[in-house]
């Protein structure tokens, strides 16, 4: 399912408003993975599709942030990995330190194997390729798999989602009227 999306981490998605009531939206950089897994959980697969709206895709990139794990791609990769651990656990996957180390080792080996391929693609397309920085990035992401896994194991009660609208409406039955009133009073 996840592998079928071309830009699963792009940050752009759309859905019909009737789906919104049951979806729990993640409150961190795991947004896209969390949303896709919520859609998978709540919808039949033939109601899900990807649409390319442009021939060119210009995504605004984050800095790598090698020195500050609370920012940039370092923070993003940590949150995304933790999101994947959480979601896989909801499908019955069991995690341990050993399993997380195995996932990190598999990621690291696959990433290293792809470096040569990406470098060749860059050369063929006249794009500069910084092999050293690419390898540093791979090492950072591998470390973040371990740290995200450790966070997941040591904080099992974390609530990473914003409550679904169905839950909000059950706690505050007139929430939608209050929101309309708030918007009207600002307008």
PLM regions and their residue ranges:
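Short, flexible, basic/aromatic active-site loop/helix in glycosyltransferases
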Residues: 1-5
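Conserved glycosyltransferase catalytic-site signature
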Residues: 8, 29-37
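Conserved nucleotide-sugar donor-binding
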Residues: 8-23
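Short conserved micro-motifs at the rims of enzyme active sites and ligand-binding pockets
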Residues: 24, 60-64, 95
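Catalytic donor-sugar/metal-binding loop of nucleotide-sugar-dependent glycosyltransferases
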Residues: 27, 37-56
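Active-site donor/metal-binding and catalytic loop motifs
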Residues: 49-69
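Terminal low-complexity segments of carbohydrate-biosynthetic enzymes
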Residues: 67-187
């Amino acid at each position: 399912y996840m592998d079928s999306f071309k830009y699963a981490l792009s940050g752009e998605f759309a859905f019909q408003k009737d789906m919104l009531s049951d979806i729990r939206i993640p409150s961190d950089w795991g947004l896209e993975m969390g949303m896709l897994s919520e859609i998978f959980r709540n919808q039949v697969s033939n109601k899900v599709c990807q649409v390319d709206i442009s021939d060119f895709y210009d995504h605004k990139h984050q800095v790598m942030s090698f020195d500050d794990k609370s920012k940039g791609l370092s923070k993003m990769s940590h949150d995304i990995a933790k999101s994947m651990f959480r979601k896989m656990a909801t499908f019955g996957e069991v995690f341990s330190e050993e399993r997380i180390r195995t996932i990190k080792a598999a990621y690291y080996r696959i990433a290293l194997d792809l470096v040569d391929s990406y470098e060749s693609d860059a050369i063929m397309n006249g794009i500069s390729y910084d092999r050293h920085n690419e390898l540093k990035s791979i090492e950072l992401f591998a470390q973040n798999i371990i740290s995200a896994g450790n966070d997941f194991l040591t904080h099992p009660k974390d609530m990473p989602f914003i409550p679904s609208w169905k839950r909000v409406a059950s706690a505050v039955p007139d929430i939608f009227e209050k929101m309309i009133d708030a918007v009207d009073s600002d307008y």
